């Protein structure tokens, strides 16, 4: 059966059919037959959301709305099933006629979250997101920003900024070279004779030495604390807690 829609429509609408028979006419509402212009739906999402700050430059998705719901979009025309694994919950994505898969999550708590795309059973990183070491592997991440109360971990104008340095050292315990990340306060280069206290800051489970400076913004936290007088200038050393036992991922040791 074919019909022509003469009036332009936007959004989702019910389709009604009138069947003429010997005993009169009947009106049926096939409420599962819905149509929409997919480009209009995408545009509607963009109007009420903003790009996640953890996106690669130029990527429009993932996006976040005012309720902290995340919107994911992924192009995979040959895939048969895709899910987003975020915050311990798997969301089934829906495929459109152009091969784009989309989904909206439940509201997320503010802060940083790891997530994965599960494409036909294979867990992969989202090419639209920067990757971070977490969950014992390289993973995609999405940052749900706080409001004004989150300024303590954001870089501020007029605040002297320190540095995070990647340092290589030889471990006598492991008999191998290792890497650690070291924060130095803004005054460090101009006070070469000053001795500073040292804070050794460990990451969470499944992360590594980059966690606090990359996902945790510790350098901005330290800069702001020092500038406000709430903290004395100090060095912060961040090393990997993976000393003896290897990380395990999905029940198997990493190879």
Which residues make up each language-model segment?
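Alpha-glucan (starch/glycogen) binding determinants
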Residues: 16-18, 74, 80-143
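Cap/lid segment of the alpha/beta-hydrolase catalytic domain
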Residues: 162, 168-176, 199-255
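Extracellular ectodomain segments of secreted/surface proteins
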Residues: 43-75
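Short, solvent-exposed loop/turn and secondary-structure capping segments
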Residues: 27-29, 85-87, 114-118, 127-129, ...
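Extracytoplasmic
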Residues: 1-42, 147
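N-terminal cap/lid segment of alpha/beta-hydrolase-fold proteins
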Residues: 63-77, 90, 94-97, 105-106, ...
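Extracytoplasmic/periplasmic copper-protein system
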Residues: 30-51, 139-156
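Surface-exposed acidic, glycine-flexible loop patches that form ligand/cofactor-binding
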Residues: 187-194, 226-230
């Amino acid at each position: 059966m074919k019909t022509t829609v003469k009036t332009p429509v936007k959004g989702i609408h019910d389709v009604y059919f009138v069947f003429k028979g010997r005993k009169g006419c009947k009106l049926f509402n096939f409420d599962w037959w819905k149509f929409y212009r997919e480009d209009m739906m995408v545009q509607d999402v963009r109007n009420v959301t903003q790009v996640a700050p953890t996106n690669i430059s130029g990527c429009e998705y993932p996006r976040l709305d005012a309720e902290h719901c995340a919107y994911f979009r992924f192009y995979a025309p040959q895939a048969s099933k895709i899910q987003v694994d975020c915050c311990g919950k798997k969301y089934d994505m829906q495929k459109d006629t152009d091969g784009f898969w989309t989904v909206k999550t439940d509201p997320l708590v503010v802060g940083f979250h790891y997530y994965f795309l599960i494409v036909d059973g294979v867990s992969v990183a989202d090419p639209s997101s920067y990757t971070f070491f977490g969950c014992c592997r390289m993973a995609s991440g999405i940052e749900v920003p706080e409001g004004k109360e989150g300024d303590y971990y954001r870089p501020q104008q007029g605040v002297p900024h320190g540095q995070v340095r990647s340092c290589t050292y030889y471990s006598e315990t492991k008999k191998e070279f290792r890497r650690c990340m070291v924060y130095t306060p803004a005054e460090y280069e101009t006070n070469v004779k000053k001795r500073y206290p040292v804070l050794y800051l460990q990451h969470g489970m499944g992360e590594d030495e980059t966690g606090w400076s990359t996902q945790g913004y510790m350098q901005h936290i330290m800069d702001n604390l020092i500038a406000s007088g709430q903290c004395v200038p100090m060095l912060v050393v961040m090393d990997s807690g993976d000393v003896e036992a290897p990380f395990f991922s999905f029940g198997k040791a990493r190879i």
